[in-house]
Curated annotation (Swiss-Prot):
Phosphoserine modifications at: 92
Active-site residues, as the UniProt record annotates them: 603
Pathway entry: Purine metabolism; 3',5'-cyclic GMP degradation; GMP from 3',5'-cyclic GMP: step 1/1
The protein, known as: cGMP-specific 3',5'-cyclic phosphodiesterase
Annotated positions binding Mg(2+): 644
Domain free text: Composed of a C-terminal catalytic domain containing two putative divalent metal sites and an N-terminal regulatory domain which contains two homologous allosteric cGMP-binding regions, A and B.
PTM info: Phosphorylation is regulated by binding of cGMP to the two allosteric sites. Phosphorylation by PRKG1 leads to its activation.
GO-annotated biological processes: cGMP catabolic process; cGMP metabolic process; negative regulation of cardiac muscle contraction; negative regulation of T cell proliferation; oocyte development; positive regulation of cardiac muscle hypertrophy; positive regulation of G protein-coupled receptor signaling pathway; positive regulation of oocyte development
UniProt keyword terms in alphabetical order: Allosteric enzyme, cGMP, cGMP-binding, Hydrolase, Magnesium, Metal-binding, Nucleotide-binding, Phosphoprotein, Repeat, Zinc
One Pfam family hit: PDEase_I
Organism: Mus musculus
Catalytic activity: 3',5'-cyclic GMP + H2O = GMP + H(+)
Span of domain GAF: 154-304, 336-493
Binding site for 3',5'-cyclic GMP: 807
Length: 865
């Protein structure tokens, strides 16, 4: 038996969990680093639920722990592992791994929202104050107060309790607390947070009375302005004292102790006032009272500072939640401008506590006026709106402020419109508006994404006190919030306007398509004539000679070409297999014919018909139909007939150079895409739906093949793809079983049929070449006249003597190798190759003849010289 070596023993120990745990305990730096790098959210949450949630931890302890963790993280070798040049993040994703409240919540009605109910947070009740006079008990009361301060952030409740504590020391009859505030002009004033706190008074009683005092006026205003305490023995002997409050309340003020409350920057944030010393020292406050009052007010300063930070964070959180809700609303509703404006107005009214919200939409056609005005009042929030009532209300709206803001592109904040001299209320500008209805006003422009154009104006009227409902001025916070709010309003309005514009464009398009489809469809008389003729007799394919690769249409009338097309559909079993109605097929054929332009020399109905005839011959005589599905056969014949629909007699290059609107629709194969779109329009026009017998999947498959086949007639795509096909043929690797190879073959077959005029008997080929040249020369003339450019030789009427040599070059570069490859796939398509070779010989002979004539002409000219 072999003995275990030292390495084996060490390996077994390392696999022992107890040994691993002991090692981790001995290497705490590594353990901490490993936990920081590897711990998951679930692990941290489990640790919290097991250890933290059941242990009450004071905030100071948590703060100290956080600071120690921060230090450890900074000292950890893994803490600073950022790549040089990487952007620094203000907040790490790991900071969000601790358990937080859900971002998205549902309200009582089940509606998803970003707004949470912050009023439901549980707080420990404040401990009742103790009024012992013993110094040890005073210390206990201070500790008790510190405990309350550390766990509560309600400034009103805490300051109320502080005053009750103070009462046990200085024994005043009444206490009041005033906080420093700023209006929209940044002018300071004082608002009572607690007023007339007395022994036995409740928090609700003390906080209900709200009084506003002017800065540097009265005793409280003076203390706030200068930051120095005042101890007044007889208030009525001090000229700064305002006796109006006594006259209103019936209370007699005698002695006053008034002290400032400062923050850590020594700025006055509030003023505390004690009135009427109740016992001792002749009813006046002593120096000891001042010291005790100042000591406790230091706690008030801490409370105010913490509470202001907390309230600011709550306000910012609430703001962000409202803005998130508004963003969600904007992206949720984009169909109706009226609906989205109603939701925006309701959100603004509810959050900002205003009486009225009016949103003006600027008229794009007439920038000096508004196209729409949406008005909502606080009573309408949550109720269905009546359009008639809203129109009547719109007549009572004053446009003066909105017009001013639109022109200046700057916000407007008016504390009291009746005192603003910029906008005098006269009969001319007042209209039907009742002046007393408007007190304070805030008006902000709504700009577009580029910030250089006003698309609307948001006007708020009468900000209300939450408790009393009294009208007050809008402050700077309101301005900032509305400024952020209108950014989302602008997005919503722009998105909705774009949606409405798209809807109007789509409606116009539908009407246009309806008109086009009516004019694109064949006339009923012509359809009935073809239907009657084809019902009587349609000659056989042999009689019509449409199975011959040498077929010529020159002797046929347009009606006879339509009969030939019906025969093609019939002999390919397409009518029977896809339940085509005879009337619909006749109308579709004549509609296709109608949508080829008669003023185009070559790319007209006759070219489309000849392409379809060559496709029919390849399928039947070339025996290619046996290797295709019925859907592929159907798609190829439709594509052959439709592949040049609405051809304008110019190529893609001309369309691009002339900056034709078609060039903006497609990035490549411009005309081919247009041909397919026209094909689709006819197939979907009423009375032309020959594919109505197909299932949905069959219909999609057929359209896909039709599109691929029509796009394949772009010679640029043919040149790009032919190398792959020729290589498969050369290596004898082509197979119809491979879907990609089959798709490639269908594309090559479409090109072969499109160019089949080059394979016709010489008299036919020569006549067609003249038609092609006429069309090309017309394009060259347009290039010279409209684009001021010299056309290529192929398009140049002055170079028509080069047609034979150019035809030889075209056959060698484009045609010959294609028909050779097609013959390898189906030997029955050999007539196409033979015809191409014979015509090459003819063109070559003409080219040589032209060259001799040119040489003879030069020789004769030389002899004359």
């Amino acid at each position: 038996m072999e003995r275990a070596g030292p390495n084996s023993v060490r390996s077994q120990q390392q696999r022992d969990p107890d040994w691993v745990e002991a090692w981790l305990d001995d290497h705490r730096d590594f353990t901490f680093s490993y936990f920081i790098r590897k711990a998951t959210r679930d692990m941290v949450n489990a640790w919290f639920s097991e250890r933290v949630h059941n242990i009450p931890v004071c905030k100071e302890g948590i703060r100290a722990h956080t600071e120690s963790c921060s230090c450890s993280l900074q000292q950890s070798p893994h803490a600073d592992n950022t790549t040089p040049g990487a952007p620094a993040r203000k907040i790490s994703a790991s900071e969000f791994d601790r358990p937080l409240r859900p971002i998205v919540v549902k309200d009582s009605e089940g509606t998803v929202s970003f707004l949470s109910d912050s009023g439901k947070k549980e707080q420990m009740p404040l401990t009742p104050p103790r009024f012992d006079s013993d110094e040890g008990d005073q210390c206990s009361r201070l500790l008790e107060l510190v405990k309350d301060i550390s766990s509560h952030l309600d400034v009103t409740a805490l300051c109320h309790k502080i005053f009750l504590h103070i009462h046990g020391l200085i024994s005043a009859d009444r206490y009041s607390l005033f906080l420093v505030c700023e209006d929209s002009s940044k002018d300071k004033f004082l608002i009572s947070r607690l007023f007339d706190v007395a022994e036995g008074s409740t928090l609700e009683e003390a906080s209900n009375n709200c009084i506003r005092l002017e800065w540097n006026k009265g005793i409280v205003g003076h203390v706030a302005a200068f930051g120095e305490p005042l101890n007044i023995k007889d208030a009525y002997e001090d000229p700064r004292f305002n006796a109006e409050v006594d006259q209103i309340t019936g209370y007699k003020t005698q002695s006053i102790l008034c002290m400032p409350i400062k923050n850590h920057r020594e700025e006055v944030v509030g003023v505390a006032q004690a009135i009427n010393k109740k016992s001792g020292n002749g009813g006046t406050f002593t120096e000891k009272d001042e010291k005790d009052f100042a000591a406790y007010l230091a706690f008030c300063g801490i409370v105010l500072h913490n509470a202001q930070l907390y309230e600011t964070s709550l306000l910012e959180n609430k703001r962000n939640q409202v803005l998130l809700d508004l963003a969600s609303l904007i992206f949720e509703e984009q169909q109706s401008l009226e609906v989205i404006l109603k939701k925006i107005a309701a959100t603004i009214i509810s959050f900002m506590q205003v009486q009225k919200c009016t949103i003006f939409i600027v008229d794009e056609d007439c920038p000096d006026s508004f196209s729409r005005v949406f008005h909502m009042e606080c009573e309408e929030v949550g109720k269905p709106s009546d359009p008639l009532t809203r129109e009547q209300d719109a007549n009572k709206i004053n446009y003066m402020y909105a017009q001013y803001v639109k022109n200046t592109m700057e916000p407007l904040n008016i504390p009291d419109v009746t005192k603003d001299k910029r906008f005098p209320w006269t009969n001319e500008n007042m209209g039907h508006v009742n002046t007393p209805c408007i007190g304070s006003l805030l008006c902000t422009p709504i700009k577009n994404g580029k910030k250089n154009k006003v698309i609307g104006v948001c006007q708020l009227v009468n900000k209300m006190e939450e408790n009393t409902g009294k009208i007050k001025a809008f402050n700077q916070n309101d301005e900032q919030f509305l400024e952020a709010f209108v950014i989302f309003c602008g997005l919503g309005i722009q998105n909705t306007q774009m949606y409405e514009a798209v809807e109007r464009a789509m409606a116009k398009q539908m009407v246009t398509l309806e008109v086009l489809s009516y004019h694109a469809s064949a006339a009923e008389e012509e359809t009935r004539e073809l239907q009657a003729l084809s019902a009587a007799v349609v000659p056989s394919a042999q009689t019509l000679k449409i199975t011959d690769f040498s077929f010529s249409d020159f002797e046929l009338s347009d009606l006879e070409t339509a009969l030939c097309t019906i025969r093609m559909f019939t002999d390919l079993n397409l009518v029977q297999n896809f339940q085509m109605k005879h009337e619909v097929l006749c109308r579709w054929i004549l509609s296709v014919k109608k949508n080829y332009r008669k003023n185009v020399a070559y790319h007209n109905w006759r070219h489309a018909f000849n392409t379809a005839q060559c496709m029919f011959a390849a399928l039947k005589a070339g025996k290619i139909q046996n290797k295709l599905t019925d859907l592929e056969t159907l798609a190829l014949l439709i594509a052959a007939l439709s592949h040049d629909l609405d051809h304008r007699g110019v190529n893609n290059s001309y369309i691009q150079r002339s900056e034709h609107p078609l060039a903006q629709l497609y990035c490549h194969s411009i005309m081919e895409h247009h041909h397919f779109d026209q094909c689709l329009m006819i197939l979907n026009s009423p009375g032309n739906q020959i594919l109505s017998g197909l299932s949905i999947d069959e219909y999609k498959t057929t359209l896909k093949i039709i599109k691929q086949a029509i796009l394949a007639t772009d010679l640029a795509l043919y040149i790009k793809r032919r190398g792959e096909f020729f290589e498969l043929i050369r290596k004898n690797q082509f197979s119809f079983e491979d879907p990609l190879q089959k798709e490639l073959f269908l594309a090559m077959l479409m090109t072969a049929c499109d160019l089949s005029a080059i394979t016709k008997p010489w008299p036919i080929q020569q006549r067609i070449a003249e038609l092609v040249a006429a069309e090309f020369f017309d394009q060259g003339d347009r290039e010279r006249k409209e684009l001021n450019m010299e056309p290529a030789d192929l398009m140049n009427r002055e170079k028509k003597n080069k047609i034979p040599s150019m035809q030889v070059g075209f056959i060698d570069a484009i045609c010959l190798q294609l028909y050779e490859a097609l013959t390898h796939v189906s030997e029955d398509c050999l007539p196409l190759l033979d015809g191409c070779r014979k015509n090459r010989q003819k063109w070559q002979a003409l080219a040589e003849q032209q060259e001799k004539m040119l040489l003879n002409g030069e020789s004769s000219q030389g002899k004359r010289d």
